[in-house]
Structure formats: structure tokens, C-alpha cells
Amino acid sequence: MLRIPGKSLGYHEDISLTPWQAILASVIVLLGLKVATILYTAFYNVFLHPLRRFPGPVTWIAAPWMKSISHIRGQQDHQIVKLHQKLGHIIRVGPDTLSFTEMSAWRDIYGTGHAELPKHIYKGSGMEERPNIITAHSRDHHRFRKAMTPALTPEAITHEEALIKGYVDMLIEHLHKFAKSSDPYVNVSQWYTMTTFDIFGDLCYGESFNSLATGKQHLWLKSMSSMKVLVPLLVFPYISWLLVWWLLSPEQQRSLSDHQKRSYELTMKRIANRDTHPRHDFMTFMLRNRGEDQGVTDHELASNSDIVISAGSETTSTALTGITFFLCSNPDAMARCAKEVREAFKSDDEITFKATAELPFMLACIEETLRMYPPVPTSLIRRTLPGRPTLIAGELIPENTIVGVHHLATYRSERNFFDAKAFRPERWLAETRNDPKSPFKDDRLDAVRPFSYGPRNCIGRNLAYHEMRLILAKLLWHFDLKLKPGYEDWGFKQRTFQLWEKPKLVVEFKERQFQV
């Protein structure tokens, strides 16, 4: 029996509580304190916080978990686009988070004109324990980038052209078989992913995953689908493991676990064969300083190889799928692009990395797709430095604020582009930019940074462009393409989980009729 002095509570007699009553009373008091803390925090965030002058949704500011739920549902990026359209180029999307669509914010957040703003990693998510070029702090990032850069120089990429063309030709062979069959409909999303995945696997590990050879998706691709669902869960510090257990199926959890083991085993196999490997690939360059102070460890090799393959193959295949959708949805652009390709090349053998870089309208179509459907539609967030405010887009931003330029919102902003929601590749042509009467003359083309900006921009940018140009040119040279009915809204109703959900896109392939 617990006895509480009654006088302390205004009673004449002492109060006696059983153990269970005491426990219940303690729970009620603790819950009351927790509710009071939540209410005070919400009030502070909305009315007293240093960021209170920036507009934003009250629900996300007062209760950040509401934003996290939107993220898990795959709707957060679409809501941010709408919020920017309504509230302006700087909005508050969390208690300590600002989103930007102003072009100058690229330089201010990601550029080199100041001390580097550190990447924001959610503590307790486990991401800080994975040493790779995306999550690494500044010093390790420089070390990883130094190890990878030689593999992605123009000379190194040219050296790999024959290998890449071999996989692209294998894709074309498969598509010819579909075009000649009674069912000429192809899920291009799947086949593009298998192609880029095989390419990056060979470039990284020196061996193919054989997705194109077998016509079947490798287990790695299935694990990538699970990882897309996993990413939003990482914003819940310290309980992400519990959410993974609760929300992911046993098969998805097993797939993620197997993926980590598979990546490490492939890396160790490639290291073991380093002296007998017949050609230079990514790993050849990364192994040069292995184990040295400025080199990379075996664990870091495995982690970075995983990132190179997963991020490189997924983003490139996403862009290719988007290009196919927008061209098929815009017959005039498709006809002009196909005409340009077919007039430029008399035979398939003439289609090379160098030659495809000289097709202005096709390049414009690629750039416009990256604007309309950026492979990474969200923000790559940073945190402002402690101890002083940071000037971003003309505004002094308080210390320790999470900031980022939101790709999708920036690219679809009417402040930045005329007819921003429409696929208009002509906006990228030199003659359009130089025409004072063009409605696109004031477009802020430099606001489009699908490969990010500054010292942490995508290291594989040039390789990605080579792949996209080569694959698109060969497709348009060999085939006439048409969307299967029912896929007209494919590009506008997708969920996002840092990357696009990217459901299947089915296209009819018809062999090109050559003029005799």
C-alpha cells in the first residue's frame, strides 16, 4: 500500500493507493506530461520557431509525423509541388526544414562558394553506418570520389563503349523478336532496367548479371523494389527496424538481407581475381589504393559498388522509360526526333557515343524529359552550419536548418519555365533560346540539375548521358513506337519514394519500314 500525504494535495487525510493504483496514476501522469510536451512543441513550432516567417502546411510543421506518413504513402513530393505553386519559391515543409525552387539556391546550398553544408542523415536510421559516396561526410566523400573518378573519365568511358554497345545490341535483338511476334507489346521499364543493370554489373564486377541473356530479372532487381519501399521508413529515428519488420513482407525482408550478402560476395570475388582480370573496369581503378590511408577498405568497396550499380542502373533506366513515355505521348516530337536520327545514320554501325552527341533535337528531348520526370524527384537535403546564419536565395537561414532544392517542384514551376507542365523539347534548342520572340526565352534552363550540383554532383553523369543517347538513337533507328492503350497517364500518377515507383510501361514495337 502506497501512502501519499493528504495535506500536500489539500486533503485532511492521507491517501492510500494499492500498487496497481499507484502504477496507473504514474502512467496517467506520464501520459499527461507527454501530451503537454507534444502540445507545447507544436505551439512552439508554429508560433515561436525561428522559421515561423516562412509559409508551409501547419499540419507538417506542428506534427512532423504527418509528413512522414505522406512520404510512406508516396505522396510527399507531389504535395510539395502543389505547396510551392501555392506559397512561393521558399516554403517550410517541417519544423526545421525549408524547400526551395529558386535557381540561385543550387549554388547557395550545394556550391563551393562557402564551407560545405553537410548532408543531413537521419540519426538512428542506420544510414550513417553505411560508408558510401552518397552518405559519406566530406572527407570520406572526397576519398571515394578520388578512387572512382579515373573510371569515369572521357577516356575510360570511350574504352568501355564496345562493351556497352554489346548490351544495347542485345536489347535491340530482343525487341526485334517482340516486334515480329503476334504480341509486339513490351514492358520497356523492365527491359531498360535489365539492360542498364547488366551494363553496370559488368563495368563494376567484370561479369554480367545475364538479365538480357536469360530474359529474366536478376534477384538484385527484386531487392531494389524492396529498397524503394524501405527508404521512407528511415526517417523514423531508432524505430526504422521495427517499421521494416511490421510493414515489409518476410519475402521483402529476406530479399534485402540477401542483397547485402550478394553484394559483398561479388566484391570479394572481384578482389580475389584482381591480378587475372582481363580488362579495366570500375573495380580496377578503385582497387589501386585499396587498404592505404587514401584508399578504400573492402567493406567500403562493397558498399560503393552496391551504390554504383543500384543508383546508376535505376536512374538511367528511369530516364529512358520517361523519354519513351513522353515521346510516345507527343507524336510531333516523336516524328521529329525519329527523322533526325534516321537521317543522321545510314546504318546501325554508325550509331556511336560521339555521333549521338550531335543530334540537337534528340538531346533536347532527353533534357526535357529530365525536367518533366527527373530520376530523383525529391530534395537532396543539407543542414546549415551551426553558429551562424546562411544566405540562401536571398534569405538569411538560421543555423541547423535542413534545406534542399526540390527537383520536381523546381522543374515544374511556372516561375522558372513557360508552360512548365507541358513536354516542350524545343525550349532547349539554341535557336529558341536566341529568339527574342520565343515564349521560352526567359526559361531558367540552369535551374534543371537532375545530376545535382557542386562537389557532390553525380559522378556518373557523362556515362548516363552516353547510355541514354545510344539506346534512344538505336531504338528510334530500328523501330516505330506507340503506347499501348491504357498507359496515357503513366507519367502523372506515380508515387515517389526518393525515386519514382516506376510501374510498367507497355509500348508497341513495330519494325521500321526502310525506303527502297
Curated annotation (Swiss-Prot):
Annotated glycosylation sites: N187
Biological classification of the source: Eukaryota, Fungi, Dikarya, Ascomycota, Pezizomycotina
Protein name: Cytochrome P450 monooxygenase dtxS2
Residues bound to heme: C458
GO MF term (any one): monooxygenase activity
Function, in words: Cytochrome P450 monooxygenase; part of the gene cluster that mediates the biosynthesis of destruxins, insecticidal cyclic hexadepsipeptides which induce flaccid paralysis and visceral muscle contraction in insects through targeting the calcium channels and vacuolar-type ATPases. The aldo-keto reductase dtxS3 converts alpha-ketoisocaproic acid from deaminated leucine into alpha-hydroxyisocaproic acid (HIC), which is the first substrate for destruxin assembly by dtxS1.
One Pfam family from the record: p450
Organism, as annotated: Metarhizium robertsii (strain ARSEF 23 / ATCC MYA-3075) (Metarhizium anisopliae (strain ARSEF 23))
Key words, A-Z: Glycoprotein, Heme, Iron, Membrane, Metal-binding, Monooxygenase, Oxidoreductase, Transmembrane, Transmembrane helix
Keyword tRNA-binding assigned: no
Effect of disrupting the coding gene: Leads to the accumulation of intermediary metabolites destruxin B, destruxin B2 and desmethyl-B.
Record's bilayer topology term: Multi-pass membrane protein
Keyword Glycoprotein: yes
Pathway named in the protein's UniProt entry: Secondary metabolite biosynthesis
PROSITE patterns hit by this protein: CYTOCHROME_P450
GO cellular component: membrane
Main localization (coarse): membrane
Compartments where located: Membrane
Family, similarity comment: Belongs to the cytochrome P450 family.
Gene3D superfamilies in alphabetical order: Cytochrome P450 (1.10.630.10)
Top-level taxon: Eukaryota
Reported cofactor(s): heme
Membrane spanning residue stretches: 23-43, 229-249
